[in-house]
């Protein structure tokens, strides 16, 4: 038997109206065996399921797009990485990828707890000290050379003041070209 109603809600509303009419005419109580959902509730239920379906479909599509993007990026990275000759755009892409990944790591590795952060800093500094090469001899040589240079600089300045050595650009006994005595007073 085909129904002449356009939706379940309109059929329910019509049946409910007829039942109320008969109960008023026959002076009987309306049977309460059926649930008491009205047309608006049925519309809302139907609409919410459609909204949920659309929302779920949108989530599924977005997830698929993200997977596709990630896969394409992975393929591009592997292609560029395995290339023998990398051109300028490939190098730029790789450096951009490195910066992006470093930023992700830095943003995700922030520690909120002060004590844990302090302990992490101590452990990382100990590891860096162990990994760092020992530069004892060279450092001593560099420091020794710096002291030698200081002696040389002192000797040079003394000779300049005595007038033994002339410095390029200055004439002994004369003031520089742009020198004003009124400026120094």
Swiss-Prot record:
Write out the annotated subcellular location. Nucleus, Nucleolus
> In the UniProt record, which is one GO cellular component term?
nucleolus
- Subcellular location, principal: nucleus
The record, for InterPro entries, names:
Rrt14
Its keywords, alphabetically, are: Nucleus, Transcription, Transcription regulation
Q: Which family does it belong to?
A: Belongs to the RRT14 family.
Function per UniProt: Involved in ribosome biogenesis, probably through modulation of rDNA transcription.
Name this polypeptide is given? Regulator of rDNA transcription 14
Q: What organism is listed for this UniProt entry?
A: Candida tropicalis (strain ATCC MYA-3404 / T1) (Yeast)
